[in-house]
From Swiss-Prot:
Binds 1 zinc ion. This is Endoribonuclease YbeY. Belongs to the endoribonuclease YbeY family. GO terms for molecular function: metalloendopeptidase activity; RNA endonuclease activity; zinc ion binding. Its EC number is 3.1.-.-. The keyword rRNA processing applies.
Amino acid sequence: MKIKIHNKTNISIKYLTKILKKIFFFVPERQNIHIIFITPLKMKKMNFYYRQKDYDTDVLSFINEIDKDSLGDIFINLKKAQKQSQNYNHSLSREVCFLATHGYLHLKGYEHHSKDELKKMLIIQEKMLKKVDLDKKIISKNKKNNND
Protein backbone atom coordinates (compact mmCIF):
# COMPACT_ATOMS: atom_id res chain seq x y z
CA MET A 1 0.00 0.00 0.00
CA LYS A 2 1.27 3.44 -0.80
CA ILE A 3 0.86 6.23 1.69
CA LYS A 4 1.10 9.95 1.24
CA ILE A 5 2.05 11.96 4.29
CA HIS A 6 1.17 15.60 4.86
CA ASN A 7 2.39 17.63 7.82
CA LYS A 8 0.20 20.60 8.78
CA THR A 9 2.08 21.19 12.05
CA ASN A 10 5.38 22.85 12.89
CA ILE A 11 6.82 19.59 14.28
CA SER A 12 9.37 17.66 12.22
CA ILE A 13 8.13 14.20 11.22
CA LYS A 14 10.95 12.88 9.01
CA TYR A 15 11.61 9.81 11.18
CA LEU A 16 7.86 9.13 11.47
CA THR A 17 7.51 9.17 7.70
CA LYS A 18 10.00 6.32 7.34
CA ILE A 19 8.35 4.05 9.91
CA LEU A 20 4.84 4.75 8.58
CA LYS A 21 5.91 3.83 5.06
CA LYS A 22 7.49 0.67 6.44
CA ILE A 23 4.39 -0.43 8.39
CA PHE A 24 2.04 0.08 5.44
CA PHE A 25 4.47 -1.63 3.05
CA PHE A 26 3.14 -4.93 4.45
CA VAL A 27 -0.51 -4.09 3.70
CA PRO A 28 -1.61 -5.77 0.44
CA GLU A 29 -3.84 -2.94 -0.81
CA ARG A 30 -3.75 -1.37 -4.23
CA GLN A 31 -5.38 1.84 -3.01
CA ASN A 32 -3.35 4.53 -1.30
CA ILE A 33 -4.09 6.43 1.88
CA HIS A 34 -3.24 9.92 3.03
CA ILE A 35 -1.96 10.48 6.56
CA ILE A 36 -2.29 14.10 7.61
CA PHE A 37 -0.71 15.43 10.80
CA ILE A 38 -2.72 18.32 12.20
CA THR A 39 -2.84 20.63 15.21
CA PRO A 40 -5.12 20.12 18.23
CA LEU A 41 -7.24 23.13 17.21
CA LYS A 42 -7.82 21.77 13.71
CA MET A 43 -8.66 18.33 15.15
CA LYS A 44 -11.14 19.85 17.58
CA LYS A 45 -12.86 21.73 14.75
CA MET A 46 -13.03 18.60 12.60
CA ASN A 47 -14.30 16.48 15.48
CA PHE A 48 -17.06 18.99 16.15
CA TYR A 49 -17.99 19.45 12.50
CA TYR A 50 -18.10 15.75 11.58
CA ARG A 51 -18.98 14.08 14.89
CA GLN A 52 -20.56 16.85 16.99
CA LYS A 53 -17.93 16.23 19.70
CA ASP A 54 -16.51 19.46 21.14
CA TYR A 55 -12.99 18.30 21.98
CA ASP A 56 -9.82 17.33 20.18
CA THR A 57 -9.21 13.65 19.64
CA ASP A 58 -6.17 11.66 18.60
CA VAL A 59 -7.23 10.26 15.22
CA LEU A 60 -10.04 10.63 12.69
CA SER A 61 -10.41 8.78 9.42
CA PHE A 62 -12.61 9.41 6.41
CA ILE A 63 -13.28 7.16 3.43
CA ASN A 64 -12.53 8.78 0.08
CA GLU A 65 -15.62 8.24 -2.06
CA ILE A 66 -14.39 10.43 -4.94
CA ASP A 67 -10.94 9.06 -5.80
CA LYS A 68 -11.10 5.31 -6.51
CA ASP A 69 -7.31 5.08 -6.10
CA SER A 70 -7.53 6.34 -2.51
CA LEU A 71 -8.95 4.35 0.38
CA GLY A 72 -9.21 7.51 2.48
CA ASP A 73 -7.61 10.02 4.79
CA ILE A 74 -6.30 9.55 8.32
CA PHE A 75 -5.88 12.69 10.41
CA ILE A 76 -3.55 12.43 13.40
CA ASN A 77 -3.30 15.01 16.18
CA LEU A 78 0.47 15.04 16.62
CA LYS A 79 0.48 16.98 19.91
CA LYS A 80 -2.01 14.54 21.43
CA ALA A 81 0.06 11.61 20.14
CA GLN A 82 3.12 13.09 21.88
CA LYS A 83 1.23 13.38 25.19
CA GLN A 84 -0.21 9.87 24.88
CA SER A 85 3.19 8.35 24.15
CA GLN A 86 4.48 9.91 27.38
CA ASN A 87 1.42 8.78 29.36
CA TYR A 88 1.73 5.21 28.05
CA ASN A 89 5.52 5.25 28.46
CA HIS A 90 6.32 4.25 24.90
CA SER A 91 7.83 5.91 21.84
CA LEU A 92 6.14 8.51 19.68
CA SER A 93 6.79 6.18 16.73
CA ARG A 94 4.70 3.46 18.38
CA GLU A 95 1.89 5.88 19.24
CA VAL A 96 1.71 7.39 15.76
CA CYS A 97 1.80 3.96 14.11
CA PHE A 98 -0.85 2.73 16.54
CA LEU A 99 -3.10 5.66 15.62
CA ALA A 100 -2.41 5.23 11.89
CA THR A 101 -3.26 1.52 11.97
CA HIS A 102 -6.37 2.30 14.02
CA GLY A 103 -7.49 4.84 11.42
CA TYR A 104 -6.70 2.39 8.63
CA LEU A 105 -8.90 -0.29 10.21
CA HIS A 106 -11.77 2.20 10.43
CA LEU A 107 -11.32 2.87 6.71
CA LYS A 108 -11.62 -0.89 6.17
CA GLY A 109 -14.94 -0.93 8.05
CA TYR A 110 -13.88 -1.98 11.54
CA GLU A 111 -15.68 -0.37 14.48
CA HIS A 112 -15.36 -0.63 18.24
CA HIS A 113 -18.85 -0.19 19.63
CA SER A 114 -18.34 -3.21 21.90
CA LYS A 115 -15.44 -4.65 23.89
CA ASP A 116 -15.22 -7.60 21.48
CA GLU A 117 -14.98 -5.30 18.45
CA LEU A 118 -12.29 -3.23 20.17
CA LYS A 119 -10.35 -6.36 21.13
CA LYS A 120 -10.43 -7.59 17.53
CA MET A 121 -9.10 -4.23 16.29
CA LEU A 122 -6.36 -4.14 18.91
CA ILE A 123 -5.17 -7.64 17.99
CA ILE A 124 -4.90 -6.67 14.32
CA GLN A 125 -3.12 -3.42 15.20
CA GLU A 126 -0.58 -5.23 17.37
CA LYS A 127 0.10 -7.71 14.54
CA MET A 128 0.76 -4.80 12.18
CA LEU A 129 3.00 -3.07 14.73
CA LYS A 130 4.93 -6.27 15.38
CA LYS A 131 6.07 -6.34 11.74
CA VAL A 132 8.10 -3.18 12.42
CA ASP A 133 9.10 -4.10 15.99
CA LEU A 134 6.69 -1.66 17.63
CA ASP A 135 4.41 -4.15 19.38
CA LYS A 136 3.85 -3.93 23.14
CA LYS A 137 6.08 -6.89 23.98
CA ILE A 138 9.07 -5.42 22.12
CA ILE A 139 8.58 -1.93 23.53
CA SER A 140 8.33 -3.06 27.14
CA LYS A 141 11.49 -5.18 26.79
CA ASN A 142 13.51 -2.62 24.87
CA LYS A 143 13.54 0.71 26.69
CA LYS A 144 15.87 2.38 24.19
CA ASN A 145 12.90 2.70 21.80
CA ASN A 146 11.50 5.36 24.13
CA ASN A 147 14.02 7.91 22.91
CA ASP A 148 12.06 9.10 19.85
